[in-house]
Amino acid sequence: MRVLFAGTPAVAVPSLDALVQAGFDVVAVLTRPDAPVGRKRVLTPSPVAARAAELGIEVIHAAKVDAEVTARIAAAAPDAAAIVAYGGLIPRAALDVPRHGWINLHFSLLPAWRGAAPVQRAVMAGDDITGAVTFLLEEGLDTGPVFGTLTESVRPDDTSGELLERLSHSGAALLAQTLSAIEAGRAVAVPQSGDVSLAPKLGIDDGRIDWHEPALAIGRRARGVTPEPGAWTTLDGQRVKLEPVALRTDAPALQPGQVLLDGKSVLVGTGSHPVELTRIQPSGKKMMAAADWARGQVALEGVVFE
């Protein structure tokens, strides 16, 4: 079966590999244009584009699927299209090109967490179980009928990056299985049912820690925004980046944002019990162990994160 693959970030690469390894004829790859990366802002191909080049697959770079891009998709003559985190909308004209439609791998148990950041939102909400589904792409936001489902436990210390890494591999296998079922004529798509929740894209402000929140909520937020956009707070008006924190129910009571060096542990007060910082990156410096940062302070007494 001839398949067009659409995807952009690293989490989509396992799916591209899975389709190639399963023997599908991947006729072209649709991905976002090269983007500036690093401090020097060097234009760099997306991870999917780089992998497609290694595999010798034609790459279609597009920030928007317009009439010209749709014509290129049609020229590739795919029987089906598989899409994983492409990062753009697929208009009706393009949806109609492959006879089997576009099969989307989405990293949540739809209709829960429809949108761009399902894994991050699941971690931030404290979900115990999440998963991935393959579904028939429609013009609505992640509304199409579901072909296949897998579940994945959310571990207590999971960051969204760690959870997404696991789902990217298990989901890749699910996507290949779904396309095989479609090719064999035995795939059945079932309408979504259950409570709908939305997972809008995260912004920088989603990573800001509000120390008046309970420790559990702060821990979930810090894990949910790691690695991107990252957790942060401010000290003396300067942004300070944080890695995920540990909950400390045995620690002495502190005011929200108040910092205390307790032995080798750096504690910060919250709306409930304190949390322990693991690693911290002050403005203009490299990420370091929280204890090393604390020892470098002239005095921690009176230090309060804002």
UniProtKB/Swiss-Prot annotation:
Pfam families: Formyl_trans_C, Formyl_trans_N. Gene3D superfamilies: 3.40.50.12230. InterPro entries: Fmt, Formyl_trans_C, Formyl_transf_N, Formyl_transf_N_sf, Formyl_transferase-like_C_sf, Met-tRNA-FMT_C, Met-tRNA-FMT_N. Coiled coil: none annotated. GO terms for cellular component: cytosol. CDD domains: FMT_core_Met-tRNA-FMT_N, Met_tRNA_FMT_C. (6S)-5,6,7,8-tetrahydrofolate binds at S108, L109, L110, P111. It catalyses: L-methionyl-tRNA(fMet) + (6R)-10-formyltetrahydrofolate = N-formyl-L-methionyl-tRNA(fMet) + (6S)-5,6,7,8-tetrahydrofolate + H(+). It is an enzyme of class 2 (transferase). The keyword Transferase applies. Its EC number is 2.1.2.9. GO terms for molecular function: methionyl-tRNA formyltransferase activity. Keywords: Protein biosynthesis, Transferase. It comes from the Bacteria. Belongs to the Fmt family. Attaches a formyl group to the free amino group of methionyl-tRNA(fMet). The formyl group appears to play a dual role in the initiator identity of N-formylmethionyl-tRNA by promoting its recognition by IF2 and preventing the misappropriation of this tRNA by the elongation apparatus. This is Methionyl-tRNA formyltransferase.
